[in-house]
Structures are given as C-alpha cells and as structure tokens.
Amino acid sequence: MNILPVLLSLAAVPAHQSHFLNLLLPLWLAIPGRINARSFSRYSGWNERTFRRHFQAALPWHALHLTLVKLLVRCKAIVPRFILVMDASFIPKSGTKTSGLGAFWNSCAGRSETGLELSCIALMTWFGHHCFPISIRQTRPKKEKADRLTQYLDQLRALFRPHRAWLKEFAPILVADGQYAKKPFFDLCRAEGIAFVTKLAVNANLLIPFV
C-alpha cells in the first residue's frame, strides 16, 4: 500500500503541491548520485524550471511529518508518549552565492566557521527510540535577520501555534542543549505549559530576588 496519498490527503496539502510531492518523493529515493533540480528533471521528464519553481515556495514538510506521527499513533504502531528535542546542525559550505551562508558554530571543530545551519525540532518516543523531525528551518546569518536565539524562538512558536493542544498532551517536555538555556526560552515553555530540560552555563545567575 502506498501511504503517501493518504498522508497528503490527511495533511490537507493543496492539489498542486500534492501532485508535485507524489512525483518528487519516490523520485528522490530512486535517483543515484547528486540530488538537484537538474537530476530531478533528467529522471522525471519534467522541466528543470518546474522543480525550481516548486522549491522556491514553502512546502508543507512539517504538516506531513506530524500527520505521519498522528497516523502511527492512531494505528497503535507507536506509544503516544514523546519528548520534544531541539538542536542545530552545521553544514560546511564554501563560496559566496549560497543563500543563508554565514558564520555559525561548528561543535565538531569547536569554533565558528563559514557554512549553513539548520535548526531542527523533533519528536522522540519514550519507548522504541524513534525520532521524527517535525520542523526544520535554515538559520539566517545576522546580516540578514535577527540573532539566532530569536529565530529559534520564532520556530518554536510557529510549531506550537497550530498544534498546541496535541503537543501539550503527548509531548509535554522540551529538551535542548546549553545554547538554548536563556530566559526567553524558559518564559515561552512556561507560557505553553511544558517542562524545559537543558544544561545551564557555568555563570548562570540562579539567585531569586527577595520580595
């Protein structure tokens, strides 16, 4: 059984994007070597510009991923107990023409380097060690947009806005590393009614003002 049309229908994906994704996703798995608009065109028969036009628009990946998780829960394939995890991933990239290129922290090298950064929020099951990415955004460099913390907060708010009730019931805990241990993150998690598990910096101020 092909589950993709079912997911596209449940996620209420618009017809033009549904038609595109029905072709794109099986093709993505079948193409050998480098993946780009030209290789998609070569193996599909569609014009290269068609792929570029669709990729310039926002595709509903988060809706598909979350719909898949809800479908697995409904089918009792996984236990509906999750934690939210959030982290950023660095991608080395040289050149000057790539969109979003900037200086980002590379934890493997222990320093900032030129490249790209993707911020990911995922659902991780308590049992079975399954992980489902549900929101991925490219972090913009400082010269283009606000600082990284503001972008991370915007991403988290955008996820909670349409799915607040479901996430609060099935994923009441957010886990992130020390770079997210800032007051705005604690305030947001408190406002959403979820617990925030993180690692504080060595110079964190834990003093409670006397009232």
Regions found by a protein language model. Give the residues of each.
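Short, conserved acidic/polar surface loops in the N-terminal third of protein domains
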Residues: K93-G100, F132-S135, R148, F186-D187, ...
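Gly/serine-rich nucleotide phosphate-binding loop at the start of the catalytic core
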Residues: M1-R53, A63
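Short, glycine/acidic-rich beta->alpha junctions
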Residues: P32, L64, E113, G178-A181, ...
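Short, charged/polar micro-motifs that form catalytic or ligand-binding hotspots
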Residues: P26-A30, S41, S107-C108, V175-Q179
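Active-site-proximal, Lys/Arg-enriched surface segment
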Residues: L27, F55-F132, R140
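An internal, acidic/charged active-site-proximal segment
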Residues: T139-V211
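Electropositive, glycine- and tryptophan-enriched low-complexity nucleic-acid-binding patches
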Residues: S39, R49-R53, S107-F170
